[in-house]
Amino acid sequence: MGSKTLPAPVPIHPSLQLTNYSFLQAVNGLPTVPSDHLPNLYGFSALHAVHLHQWTLGYPAMHLPRSSFSKVPGAVSSLMDARFQLPAFPWFPHVIHPKPEITAGGSGAALKTKPRFDFANLALAATQEDPTKLGRGEGPGSPAGGLGALLDVTKLSPEKKPTRGRLPSKTKKEFVCKFCGRHFTKSYNLLIHERTHTDERPYTCDICHKAFRRQDHLRDHRYIHSKEKPFKCQECGKGFCQSRTLAVHKTLHSQVKELKTSKIKC
């Protein structure tokens, strides 16, 4: 079997020597950085899998103090090139500067001394002001208190909430017939309805002097005198002067069809 020749490693950065690859291999022996100091990042031992030019190019150089490399073995530190600089991560400041631990005499003690919620006296504890908030200036007169008052608007009942957007819909007007008490939403419909009680017919035909309650009824009536029949049946071709007369005629055709189908089934 012939021996397989491995391809030569591709240089990552022009300023780095090929000997720095041994540095990446030696980094695997370093202890893993705790996950709480590098959240959402890979461990320090996985740097050999990342192209180094993606970390060094395009970012400002950052010099770390010697204490940062206190855990690096001597064999690894001898392989480090002086020209190699770690990049700065402006979007991860907590990686370089870890969170300060809460000391026993600092704010941690204040958190421990905070009184617990008294469930025995529930009504009193709910209405009583928190002394810790008053000490930090979160009272009703403070800016934080004003913000809390604004946020309390969301807790109001639906009746007390201020209306936003559209104005409340107006109540529909109702027009009541004085003869029978029937309700209408439009005044014109009420006017036509009251003419059935009074038998008022203000629209009169000029030819035959027939009177009508509605103007559209007079318009349909005039087709009789002009012998125009604009409304024609699509089945038999018969013409009509009024649309409502054509509608009645169509019902006759539908009744005839029903009779034929019933005879066929029998």
Swiss-Prot record:
Which UniProt keywords are present, listed alphabetically? Metal-binding, Methylation, Nucleus, Repeat, Transcription, Transcription regulation, Zinc, Zinc-finger
Which phenotype arises from disrupting this gene?
Mice die prenatally with severe heart defects including defective atrioventricular junction and venous valves. They never initiate metanephric kidney formation. Nephrogenic mesenchyme undergo massive apoptosis, which causes a disruption of nephric duct elongation and failure of metanephric induction.
For the keyword Iron, the answer is no
Compartments, as annotated in UniProt: Nucleus
Which InterPro entries does UniProt cross-reference here? C2H2-ZF_Transcription_Reg, Znf_C2H2_sf, Znf_C2H2_type
Coiled-coil-forming residues are: none
Kindly indicate whether the keyword Cytoplasm belongs to this entry: no
Q: Which Pfam families match?
A: zf-C2H2
Q: Which residues does this entry mark as bearing Asymmetric dimethylarginine?
A: 116
Upregulating conditions: Transcriptionally regulated by Ikzf1 and Runx2.
Zinc finger region(s), C2H2-type: 175-197, 203-225, 231-253
Q: Name one GO molecular function term.
A: zinc ion binding
Q: Provide GO CC annotations from the record.
A: nucleoplasm; nucleus
Give GO terms for biological process: cell differentiation; cell proliferation involved in kidney development; cellular response to retinoic acid; chondrocyte differentiation; embryonic digit morphogenesis; embryonic forelimb morphogenesis; embryonic hindlimb morphogenesis; embryonic skeletal joint development
Family membership, please give it: Belongs to the Odd C2H2-type zinc-finger protein family.
Please explain the role this protein plays, according to its UniProt record.
Answer: Transcription factor that plays a role in the regulation of embryonic heart and urogenital development.
| The protein, known as | Protein odd-skipped-related 1
Native organism is Mus musculus
